[in-house]
C-alpha cells in the first residue's frame, strides 16, 4: 500500500511539475508576444520587438517616396523654394538637371520639372489632406513620356493619405511611412525594403523585402542546394563550416514559402542566417516576391542556443501576413 501511495504521489508531483512547466512556457510565449509591435510595410504586416530601430524604403512607380514632415502646410513652400534654387544652380541632390517649370498638382501638391539634355527629372512634393508631406524624385523621363509622367504624379497626389503608424491601411492600400497610397493593386510597380536592429538582441537584425517581379528565379532551396548562397549565408559558408538547422517548404498565413536556416561558430562567436522566401507571381503587387531574413552582426549572436534563436525567428515569421 505504501509503495502504491508513494508511486501515486510521485506521479502527482511529476504531473504538477509538468503542468507548471507548460504554464511557465505558455506565460513566456504570451509575454514575448505582448512585447511585439505590429508594423505595416506595403501590402504586408509583420511584428517586431518593441524598441527595435527600423528603417524602410517604399517605392511607387518604382521610385522612392519619402516622408518629409507631419507639418506639411508650413514646410512645403520652403522645401519647394529651396529645391528650385538648387536646381537653378545645378546643385540639387541626386540630379544635374536644371529647373524648367513648376506644375501645380491637386490637394496643394507641387511638381518641379527639370531637364538635362533630352531627359527630364521630376521632384514632386505630395501633401495629404491631414497635412503630411512626402517627396519623390523620378529621373530619366523622355520627352515622349513627359505628359504621361505628369499625369501619373497628379494621380499620386490624389491617392496619398496620412495614417497613424499603429493603424493598418484600408483594404487595397499600400502602406508607406505614416501613410498609404491607393493607386490600385496591379497597375504600377511597388516595392518595400525594411531593415531592423532588434531591441534586446544587439547582434541580430531582421530584413524584409517585397517587390513586383518580371521573371521568377530559382527558389531558395534550389539555390541553397546548388551552393548559390545569398550574401548572409555565403559569408558564413566562406568563413567556416555551416550547420543546416532547417531546409523545408513552409506555409505562413497562406503564403507558400521556403525556409533555410543555418548557423556557424566562428572565432568563438555564434552566427545565424535564417531565410524565408516566396518566389512571387510575375507582375503582381498582391503576390510579390518576398524575402524575410534574420542575420547576425560581426559581434555575434547573444541567443543562448539554436532552439532559442529559432523560437524567436518563428515568432517573427508567424506574424507575417498579407493585408486585405
Q: What is the predicted role of each segment?
A:
Residues 7-18:
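Bacterial N-terminal signal peptides
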Residues 19-25:
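Signal peptide processing junction and immediate N-terminal pro/mature segment
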Residues 25-37, 49-135:
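Post-signal peptide N-terminal segment of secreted/secretory-pathway proteins
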Residues 52-53, 137-177, 292-324:
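Surface-exposed amphipathic alpha-helical segments
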Residues 54-94, 137, 190-231, 259, ...:
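A short acidic-to-branched-hydrophobic micro-motif
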Residues 86-130, 209, 215-284:
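Signature of long, low-cysteine stretches enriched in small and polar/charged residues
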Residues 121-141, 278-299:
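A short, solvent-exposed beta-edge/loop patch
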Residues 144-256:
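Acidic, serine/threonine- and glycine-rich low-complexity intrinsically disordered segments
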Amino acid at each position: 500500500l505504501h509503495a502504491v501511495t508513494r508511486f501515486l504521489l510521485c506521479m502527482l508531483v511529476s504531473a504538477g511539475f509538468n503542468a507548471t512547466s507548460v504554464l511557465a512556457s505558455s506565460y513566456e510565449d504570451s509575454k514575448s508576444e505582448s512585447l511585439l509591435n505590429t508594423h505595416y510595410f506595403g501590402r504586408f504586416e509583420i511584428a517586431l520587438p518593441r524598441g527595435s530601430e527600423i528603417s524602410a524604403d517604399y517605392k511607387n512607380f518604382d521610385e522612392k517616396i519619402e516622408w518629409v514632415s507631419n507639418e506639411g502646410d508650413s514646410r512645403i513652400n520652403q522645401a519647394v523654394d529651396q529645391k528650385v534654387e538648387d536646381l537653378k544652380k545645378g546643385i540639387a541632390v541626386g540630379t544635374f538637371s536644371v529647373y524648367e517649370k513648376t506644375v501645380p498638382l491637386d490637394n496643394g501638391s507641387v511638381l518641379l520639372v527639370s531637364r538635362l539634355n533630352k531627359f527630364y527629372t521630376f521632384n514632386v512634393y505630395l501633401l495629404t489632406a491631414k497635412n503630411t508631406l512626402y517627396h519623390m524624385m523620378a529621373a530619366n523621363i523622355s520627352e515622349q513620356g513627359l505628359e504621361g509622367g505628369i499625369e501619373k504624379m497628379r494621380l499620386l497626389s490624389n491617392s496619398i493619405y496620412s495614417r497613424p503608424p499603429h493603424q493598418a491601411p484600408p483594404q487595397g492600400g499600400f502602406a508607406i511611412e505614416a501613410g498609404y497610397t491607393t493607386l490600385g493593386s496591379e497597375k504600377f510597380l511597388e516595392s518595400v525594403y525594411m531593415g531592423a536592429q532588434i531591441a534586446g538582441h544587439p547582434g541580430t537584425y531582421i530584413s524584409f523585402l517585397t517587390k513586383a517581379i518580371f521573371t521568377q528565379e530559382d527558389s531558395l532551396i534550389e539555390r541553397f542546394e546548388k551552393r548559390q548562397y545569398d550574401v548572409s549565408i555565403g559569408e558564413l559558408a566562406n568563413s567556416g563550416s555551416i550547420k543546416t538547422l532547417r531546409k523545408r517548404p513552409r506555409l505562413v498565413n497562406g503564403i507558400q514559402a521556403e525556409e533555410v536556416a543555418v548557423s556557424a561558430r566562428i572565432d568563438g562567436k555564434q552566427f545565424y542566417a535564417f531565410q524565408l522566401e516566396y518566389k512571387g507571381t510575375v507582375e503582381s503587387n498582391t503576390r510579390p516576391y518576398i524575402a524575410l531574413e534574420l542575420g547576425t552582426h560581426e559581434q555575434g549572436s547573444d541567443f543562448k542556443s539554436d532552439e532559442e534563436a529559432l523560437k524567436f525567428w518563428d515568432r517573427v515569421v508567424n506574424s507575417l501576413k498579407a493585408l486585405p
